[in-house]
């Protein structure tokens, strides 16, 4: 609604030199641009799936910590799977995710070679996905940070909702007006596509039908 109102207001602005006033001017002029709210939403929300790091200093700090923790985990696990002494013990020299935890794929017969927590196994049972003890603490820190991130996102969305609640009447009015304008323009386009014209009605009530 906010974006549509901004676009509609820009479209509806006209000067005497542009075009003569018409019956839609009153509708366009009744729209209430809520630029402050729109700016705040744009600043905080990148898409329906993503909140901007700049939405709050707290969120930026949390995500920076998450990135650093991720890098530490990957550094340790990459060193582990790249070690020549482990090549025969691993099903693949990769780092994978199981149940939200970073793991390595260990061959069943080498289970005792790696201290850690088993989070999953392959359908055949030949591969165990183990979270090495060396990264358990880091994985725990990452899960905690993910929880804090979600809480902060919910807080940001709550604040935006509160700001929107202060102008809910204006939002409702703008939405109703936009629907009416959309209906009017749809009728106009349909009439243009049909090359239609407005009928002229006689005041005496007589209808002259011509074949």
Language model: regions and residue ranges:
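Extended, well-ordered alpha-helical scaffold/bundle regions in very large, multi-domain proteins
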Residues: 27-33
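N-terminal alpha-helical targeting/anchoring segments
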Residues: 1-2, 9-12
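Alpha-helical coupling/stalk and coiled-coil linker elements that connect catalytic or binding modules
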Residues: 5-6, 15-25, 37-211
